[in-house]
């Protein structure tokens, strides 16, 4: 099977890369083993929250300029501030075109409220998520009886520290009892599958309506809206106060929805989606990827003109830690890591951890190297890249988006030259 591009990994980076390549008229396939990290995320995307020295970032352009000086090997630094901003804006346009109407400005970070009621600087958030400052003085944090993925009293306690009048309440929907037989089934995603049925909408409205009369804003867990935000908008039109939603513990409704929107758009535009498959071997001849062998296709290789590695970091098994060191399991690419295992981590759990910055070694075009030699038609994007800390620096979503589009533009340019 011949393709212009085969993308190994179906997470945020892989999907955005595929969508951008489709804009250039290239035929793409995505090989994905299972759920991506988006299923376990908040559904919000960070651009740059903090610098390597710990200084918080509010003005993105100035932050990117400082980052170039502090961390020249960071993926952003390799591209330059202006290029990063341009690609980020293009990514936001792609997301909107896919149906993910996210709120945010690439030039200026905003503060979203987290499930614990604290604030986190971010780039793009779902419109349901409350954003600071909250234009409400009387707030009711509403939990769902029996739902362990969200603790209303913890969120309320944090918000009270910001001089807000915050109460807590709980709704009990007997219609959800069918899920209570097994506590492991009473999760936000399973509740959403039930509440998203239009016939159940009035039940949720009736439960929230009495609380809405006594407050300016209701904050509740995101336990509905797997496909879209229609129910949230329907409730907001009818309730006497604003309704906002907070992400829950994984799996996350908002994260799954974002992934599904991108995946459906990719298939709608003619992309080949290969779920439940796994790349077992990649054949490289003379520094060029010629064949990609997958588990489900056995002796029928995929033959791409270009290949993209979007396999993620340790969480997605894009990187594997062993006693002897860190390795990239598909091709055995060169990995940037510390010299000894003792340097992988800091003793204080909350300090930035060196292992977070491990990843494949690439050139400035994000082409990785194998045994010191650049693989000419292979690009690495997203969390598998080295040189950034997605947790401490708050840049995971941005790096995925920016590197994906940079690789896509590079491939499209080279594909045009080869025709």
Swiss-Prot record:
GO molecular function annotations of the record: glycerol-3-phosphate dehydrogenase (quinone) activity
Gene3D superfamilies: FAD/NAD(P)-binding domain (3.50.50.60)
Spans traversing the lipid bilayer: none
InterPro entries referenced in this protein's UniProt entry, alphabetically: FAD-dep_OxRdtase_2_FAD-bd (IPR003953), FAD/NAD-bd_sf (IPR036188), G3P_DH_GlpB_su (IPR009158)
Gene: glpB
Family: Belongs to the anaerobic G-3-P dehydrogenase subunit B family.
GO cellular component labels: glycerol-3-phosphate dehydrogenase (FAD) complex
Cofactor(s) needed by this chain: FMN
The protein's annotated pathway: Polyol metabolism; glycerol degradation via glycerol kinase pathway; glycerone phosphate from sn-glycerol 3-phosphate (anaerobic route): step 1/1
Pfam families in alphabetical order: FAD_binding_2
Assembly mode: Composed of a catalytic GlpA/B dimer and of membrane bound GlpC.
Biological source species: Salmonella arizonae (strain ATCC BAA-731 / CDC346-86 / RSK2980)
Name by which UniProt lists this protein: Anaerobic glycerol-3-phosphate dehydrogenase subunit B
């Amino acid at each position: 099977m011949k393709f212009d591009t085969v993308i190994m990994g179906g997470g945020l980076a892989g999907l955005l890369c595929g969508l951008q390549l489709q804009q250039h008229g290239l035929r793409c396939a995505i090989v994905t083993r299972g759920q991506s990290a988006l299923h376990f995320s908040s559904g919000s995307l960070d651009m740059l929250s903090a610098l390597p020295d710990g200084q918080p970032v509010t003005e993105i352009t100035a932050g990117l300029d400082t980052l170039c000086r502090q961390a020249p090997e960071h993926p952003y630094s390799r591209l330059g501030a202006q290029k990063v901003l341009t690609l980020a804006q293009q990514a936001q346009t792609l997301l909107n075109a896919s149906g993910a109407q996210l709120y945010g400005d690439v030039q200026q970070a905003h503060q979203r409220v987290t499930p614990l009621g604290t604030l986190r600087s971010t780039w793009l958030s779902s419109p349901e998520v409350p954003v600071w400052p909250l234009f409400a003085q009387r707030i009711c944090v509403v939990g769902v009886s029996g739902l362990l993925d969200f603790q209303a009293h913890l969120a309320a306690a944090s918000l009270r520290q910001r001089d807000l009048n915050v109460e807590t309440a709980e709704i009990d929907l007997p219609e959800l009892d069918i899920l209570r037989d097994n506590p492991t089934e009473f999760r936000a995603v399973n509740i959403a599958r039930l509440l998203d049925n239009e016939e159940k909408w009035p039940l949720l409205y009736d439960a929230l309506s009495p609380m809405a009369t006594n407050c300016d804003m209701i904050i509740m867990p995101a336990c509905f809206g797997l496909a879209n935000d229609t129910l949230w908008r329907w409730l907001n039109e009818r309730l006497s106060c604003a309704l906002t939603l907070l992400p829950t513990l994984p799996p996350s409704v908002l994260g799954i929805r974002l992934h599904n929107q991108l995946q459906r758009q990719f298939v709608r535009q003619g992309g080949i989606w290969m779920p439940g498959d796994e790349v077992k071997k990649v054949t490289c001849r003379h520094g060029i990827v010629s064949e990609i062998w997958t588990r489900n296709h056995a002796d029928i290789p995929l033959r791409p003109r270009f290949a993209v590695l979007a396999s993620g970091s340790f969480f997605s098994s894009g990187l594997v830690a062993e006693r002897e060191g860190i390795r990239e399991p598909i091709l055995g690419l060169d990995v940037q890591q510390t010299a000894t295992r003792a340097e992988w981590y800091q003793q204080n759990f909350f300090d930035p951890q060196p292992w977070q910055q491990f990843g494949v070694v690439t050139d400035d075009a994000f082409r990785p190297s194998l045994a010191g030699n650049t693989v000419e038609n292979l690009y690495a994007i997203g969390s598998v890249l080295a040189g950034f800390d997605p947790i401490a620096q708050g840049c995971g979503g941005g790096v995925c988006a920016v590197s994906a589009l940079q690789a896509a533009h590079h491939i499209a340019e080279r594909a045009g030259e080869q025709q």
